Amino acid sequence: IEKDQWDSIDVEVGMHEYPLRSFGGTGCTCNGRHFMGTGFYRFSLDWWAEFDGKHWHERTPVPGKTRTLAASAATEQYIYVTGGTHYGGVNTTGEVLADIRRYAPQTDHWTYVAVLPEGLINHVCFTIGKRVYIGLGETSDWQINDKLYWFEE
């Protein structure tokens, strides 16, 4: 990026208003396709969408409890969405989630993978080859997590 020169694009919504007005979502690129979702707008969200550079295309929502502050990462075939906080509304304290969900872009299908040893928020998720790493961040009792977990596809 040269001397802080940024370009912006006008995004045509094509979906409900809340995806673009939410915060705390997650997103990543899988095999050249760009996905994002979850987040918070009055309550935790489960939406999932593909962005082609100009238009949003609604996809199958993330199953399980709605979430904000989740993390995601992709391998060549799948996207993994992990952890986050479930808020049922603005007056709830939230529940830190520990589940791992796998999304297959080629079939628009979600699969439950596993439960982490503890719920995590503000954490990282990344891949090296077929190994998925999840950790750091904060636990359900707001303690700093110094663990990094991993599994292989």
Segments and roles (model prediction):
Residues I1-E153:
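Kelch-like beta-propeller repeat domains
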